[in-house]
Amino acid sequence: MELFKTTPDGIVKCGKRSQRLICNFCPKIVDVIFANNNHNQKQILCLQLTATFKGSKVVKNVDIDFETISKFDPSSIDLRFAISPGKNNKDDFVAYLQSFATNIVPTEKFYIDSFGEWEHNGQYIFCLGNMLIGKNINLDDYYIDPNISQFHMNYTPNTSPQENYEALCHFMEIEDGISDVLMLYVLTSLLRPLYHKAGFKCNYILNLVGKTQSRKTTLAQLASDFFYDGAGKNSNTIRLDSSVNSIQDFLSKFKNLVAIVDDLFRDSSTKSDLKFKAQQILRQVADGTIRQNIQTNSDITNTSLIMTAELLFDTVSDLGRTQLVYVKKPIDSEKLSKSQAEKCKLYSFYVDFLIWIYESYDDILTSLKIDFEIFLTERSATKMLYMRSFEHSYIAKTTAKYTFTYAREKNLISDNKFKFIQKNMDQIIDDNYQVQLDTLDSIAKSSGETKLNPSKALFCCLKYKILDLTNDPECFLKGEKLLYIRTEKLQFVLNKKFNFQNSVKYYTDYFRKRNILVQERNGAKSTKRINNIRYLVIRLDLLLLDVDSTESMIDLFK
């Protein structure tokens, strides 16, 4: 039988002939928690570590995943804590904890392992790092994963709602048509789970475009990076010159929040690589598709994204997936500094606003469902060239409506002030929408995107059965979403029917760059092999999205 005892110097294993110090601290199991949600579960040991160093008593609390006890490194809690060297000491430390943990009845809690909205026992709550927001919630019922709880809201709980609202107004007044549109996008990201539940999906990207040193990234970080980092680092920003896998893993951590990818710049030696990488990221987020890769399975489709750039995306397909905001001159440094000085109040407004939303959740959800149903009905009856941009402006107006409705209901503004602000914000959003339309039209004309392209040509071949998908081994469907086609077959049909003069490689590169191919998991090939024959595998849902985003010629084929 293994015997252990604790001493002021740590845990000691008592053998028949000798005693051995396992570690230099005494762990006490405070609780055992069984955390569970619909997707994941975890058993946690809640430990209190106590040790005496140079006559001073040191006490630290730590939670350990039951499955990874053997990997526990006490020095990560405090450099003075240590397990004695050697595998036997490590094994005996684990055995000591397990011998006590097995005799404790676990406390069951709901497991929160990501930011954003959660539903538990019919109640909706919102997780902002170490903070949970909801109506009459009992915090003891929830366990927040340490990877999430390590993020602390950088806010001031003692400031008044009036002060916090004024901080919001100061930010929105930094630059008309820029800081206000940016703020509405950040607030939209917090409301996105609610919008989705009401029947409206709003996956889109804010594209901040301006010259270098225009302070656009600083402005975006001020609006969206609301977690405290003791090192003073920006926790939600990653550079575009990082690897795609690194960017994808980073963005996946910010589910239902905003992350920043910075920046697409004009360096001629790297511009093409950066643009291709930016295209990959924006299509995953905007289209709600997961990039398959053997090295990562991170899902970024629920992350709201701000992309900063010195240059525009030069295709309607790419730019149409974003909400464009031009930064034509440097951001006013005096106003920016003023807002930075009161950023804790700004972030306190986010908390106040979310508390109001979740206290009135059912009523707001019901109202949104009615509004969205009317909008979607009207939208389906309307033919519009750039539908996504129209949806972006609509959802921005919806967010503005609820933002200032909160202020009115909390008596922060009068009814007349509410009407004035609402009218002014609608005009700002309409102006931004018009800039987007003008830019899209300009790009379409200059690049020839109003003409037929391979995506539209293939769409027409499928729609009018120019391609036989029933009896042709070179072209067939798998399920409802995947088109398998030999590249030679694709080249022959498109070149003949639409008078193109493109090579096989051109078509392969074209559809790969549009990010609508299903590639091999290692990403080395753009084709898939079946019975030693290689096929392009095209996702039809993404082909349709690609056509919809540049649909000016589709009417010609009806």
Question: Which residues make up each language-model segment?
Answer:
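AAA+/P-loop NTPase substrate/partner-engagement loops
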Residues: 209, 219-272
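Structural recognition of the conserved hydrophobic beta-strand(s) that form the central parallel beta-sheet
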Residues: 260, 302-310, 324-326
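DNA transaction DNA-binding modules
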Residues: 124-159, 170-171, 267, 367-558
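P-loop NTPase catalytic core of nucleic-acid-dependent motor ATPases
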Residues: 140-233
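Conserved catalytic/switch belt of AAA+ P-loop NTPases
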Residues: 275-294
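AAA+/SF3 P-loop NTPase mechanochemical coupling elements
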Residues: 252-254, 292-308
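Phosphate-sensing "switch" segment of ASCE/P-loop ATPases
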Residues: 299-301, 317-416
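Conserved glycine-centered beta->alpha loop in an early N-terminal alpha/beta scaffold
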Residues: 1-177, 223, 249-250, 254-257, ...
